[in-house]
C-alpha cells in the first residue's frame, strides 16, 4: 500500500493556535505582547493581500456564474475570463493547501470499485474543462456488506476531507440530456466533504447510475425462474394452441384448428399473463435503479458544502487563514528560541511539536512562512540562520 503524503493543511483554527503557542509557557509577559503584536501585523497584512485576490476572482467569475442575478454586457465581456478564473482559483487553492488531482489519478479512480456498490458512468467529453482539487487525503476503513446485505467485509480506501470541483460547460451543451440543469458556457464550482477517491464520479452533474453484474443476476435469475413457472402454468394451453395454429399455417400439420370463443379466451388470457409478467420485470428493474439513485442523492446531500460563488469566498477565507497560521507559527518558534535557527531546524521543531503534543503529523511549509516574515520585516536571515526582528 502506497503511503499518502503528509498534509500541508494545519487542522487548527488560527485563534486556537495562538493560545496553543502561549500555553507552552516559554515566553515572558513582555515577550508575549511582542508575539501578540506580530500576530496582529500578520493578520492585517494578509487581509490587505487577499482583498486584491478576492476582487480578481469576483471579476473573473461574474460573467460565468450560473447563479448571477446581474446582466452580462457582451461588448465588455473579456473572452479570457474562463482561463483567468482557472488560474486564479488554482493559486488560491494552493495557498489553502489543496492539491490538484491529475487526469491520470481521476481515470484510475473511475476504474476502481465504488463503495456504493453501484456502477457510475461519467463522460468528461461533455465539458470544456474539468479541474479537481482535494485536501486531507487519508486512509479509512469501513465495513461494507457484500451478498444481500450480509457478510460485511472491511474495506480500506483513500478518503478526501475536502474536494473542489471546477467544470466549464460547452457553449453547445445538451441541456435536454444528463446536463439538463446546466447553463451552456457557464462555470460551475462545487465544494464537497468526506469524498472517497473511488466515488468521485458521483460529484459530476452528468453521472449515470448503472447496475453491477450481481444486481443484474438478482433480477435476471428470479425473472428466468418465474418466467419458467409462468410458461408452464399460465401459458401452457396458450402455447399448445399457438403451436397448432403455426403448424397448420406453415404446412407442418394438416389438421385444421378451430378458433372458437374458448380458444380466443385462452389466447387473450395467455397474452395478458405474458404482458403482465414483462411489465413486472421492467418495474423491478426500474425500482432497483431508482433505489441506487436515491442512495446517491442522499449521500451527496450531506457531502455538499457550497456552490459557485460561495465556493470562492470559502476557499479565499481558508487560504488567508492558512497563510496567517504558517507565518505566526514560524514567528513564535523563532521568538521562543534565543539562538537563531536554520530553516530546517525551525521546520523540524514545529512538525515535532504538532506530532508529539497534538498527535498531528503534517508537512509544514517553512520556506513560504519565512519569506512572508521577511517581507513583513518580522524576521531576517543571517548566514542561513533566522531570527526575529522585534524593533517595531
Predicted feature residues:
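Short, cationic-aromatic polyanion-contact patches
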Residues: 385-392
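Soluble catalytic regions of membrane-associated enzymes that act on cell-envelope
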Residues: 359-370
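Basic, amphipathic N-terminal segments
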Residues: 1-224
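Short acidic, hydrophobic short linear motifs in intrinsically disordered regions
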Residues: 338-357
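A short, conserved structural fragment
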Residues: 370-384
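Feature representing long, continuous alpha-helical segments
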Residues: 273-276, 325, 329, 333, ...
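Short alpha-helical segments that sit at the start of domains
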Residues: 294-340, 362
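Transmembrane alpha-helical hairpins and terminal membrane-anchor modules
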Residues: 213-299
